[in-house]
């Protein structure tokens, strides 16, 4: 009972987060890239995003390591927590990804994840029991076939030392594991059982490399854990030690239900440029299906104090509850398989440039 009062179970944390989890962004236009990172045990980017998420669209991490990473890498990386990727890795690891950069995809990602390489002992962590079997959950925002290589740091590794390939030993490789939930939907994930080595205690790190078999693109994930008899509890994030509250409820809940993933359509959000009192943003609409997407619409609620101005390559409407819905225009109505289109907008803002809760595809 004492242990349960000190820890938050990851399942409870995920249930609270995923009800209001914001979709993050992917730069560019044309080919749709995959997304994915470890959710159990939670990666640094996943748990820091959970810790930082608020009900206003602002990021306010309570964990000092997450705060430092946000200061170093900015909001773009944290909102894009499931895109620690290298488009050209092709299964390469040691000798290709430099030591000290494993948690940022060798600094080859389109996004700046350098801050998540920091060698420090105060990252959010998952509490595990040596010799037990856990179920790994790995986000499937864009599902693709391939292998998941799972590594564990060797005994004696310290979280305050740089993470290198010599610190790791491969403990499992899983090919095409099953999935729960839809790709591109809140909570959707791959899952499989992982037998943890016996005789371990203290701090460790689980490193995963997702090697796609249909592309050269690979994903990288660093999950801080401690072998102390735990059962998947998470500490070091907002609400630790009591009832989990990673995402405070907005003072005025929206009357319009949050958007849901629509078929193979996925929407990803980007702040292109910002200035005092406003910003320029874009939304990429991605088709992860095998058939053309004929017509699309995207819905979100802007951050508190944010008002959309002009919109191009899309047709906007505004709800009475503050939500925004943008539909296709004639020239970008059809999105080809594994393709994407992008619309842009300007907005006035008091600093909350990102959406409150989820942005997603809805019926046109």
From Swiss-Prot:
SMART domains listed in its UniProt record: CBD_II
Alphabetized Gene3D superfamilies for the sequence: 2.60.40.290, chitin-binding protein cbp21 (2.70.50.50)
Compartments reported by the entry: Secreted
Domain CBM2: 258-364
CDD domains: LPMO_AA10 (cd21177)
PROSITE patterns: CBM2
Pathway info: Glycan metabolism; cellulose degradation
Listed GO biological process terms: cellulose catabolic process
Extent of the signal sequence: 1-34
Keywords associated with the record: Carbohydrate metabolism, Cellulose degradation, Copper, Metal-binding, Monooxygenase, Oxidoreductase, Polysaccharide degradation, Secreted, Signal
Domain Chitin-binding type-4 as annotated: residue spans: 35-225
Protein name (Swiss-Prot/TrEMBL): Lytic cellulose monooxygenase
Chain positions recorded as Cu cation binding sites: 35, 144
Disulphide connectivity of cysteines: none
Keyword Secreted: yes
Organism: Streptomyces ambofaciens (strain ATCC 23877 / 3486 / DSM 40053 / JCM 4204 / NBRC 12836 / NRRL B-2516)
